[in-house]
Amino acid sequence: MRAMSGRASSSTSSMPTTAARRVKRDSVGRRRVTDRGRCRLLKSLASIENPTREESTATSERLETFLSRKGRHATFEATRKSARRVHQRVAGRTVREYMSLPASQYSTLDGESVERVDEDTFKVELSEFNFLGFRLKPRLRARVHVRDDGSGCEVRVEDMELSGSGVVESASDSFEIVSVNNVTWRDIELEALTEVERAVVDSEGGEFKEMMSETRVSVYLIVPGWFPFTVKSTERTGRFVVNQVVNQVVPKFLTQLTEDYRRWSSGDDSRAATGGGMFDCEVGEEECVVQDSTK
């Protein structure tokens, strides 16, 4: 698989931090998203690559429903861009050909934590980490969309389940995740090559390409009434944790992606996973201050 990266949607912008800013009662007493909240919601749906109309509609409805639920709403997000260069040999298969492979021919890249569900859908299991004193182990379901022009692919998380204590598992429906990993590539001009890369081209021919990944992850959380932390404190800790996860996973993903290309370009069609540990994360803890939980 070329890219992996509560339930899910597309990439995001920041959202209001409390339910009071997002929703208000309509004339019959139902909660609805305010104009300001709707504007922010639409901004959150503008992914790195525009989603299909079906994806956009489904995402909008899912998020709007979630944001209309009662409770204290917290939002935190992370974005990470990363790139790796790879040598495209004269006699080898090209990067464009690699990026044009159908999802059914993807390597999972990580045989330990990625499982193929069907032709374009994969299950991803992240390592366990601590969040606000609870041990969490997220399991994601992601769908891959390969662009027809060979420019890359897009991976969207469609669903998430949490395992851990009974309290953690019962809270799975209090999360909504909006996540997209956009994988692209570009040519590297000769004058932009490093000395080492230029020496490779001089001796072996070929050219260098750059594979790029831009990942955006946003998490929406309804903070339980019994939770002893404020929305602001929850969001601060959430940003800290999500940034650590994204900053570790994306570079490892690209490293394994380029290694998979090297094997495939030389004629290896086994599509076996190239390694493990891609989703193993060392997440430190940030102190979360206990305050009046009504705030």
At which residue positions do the language-model features occur?
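A generic structural signal for short beta-strands and their flanking turns/coil linkers
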Residues: 118-122, 136-140, 149-153, 175-181, ...
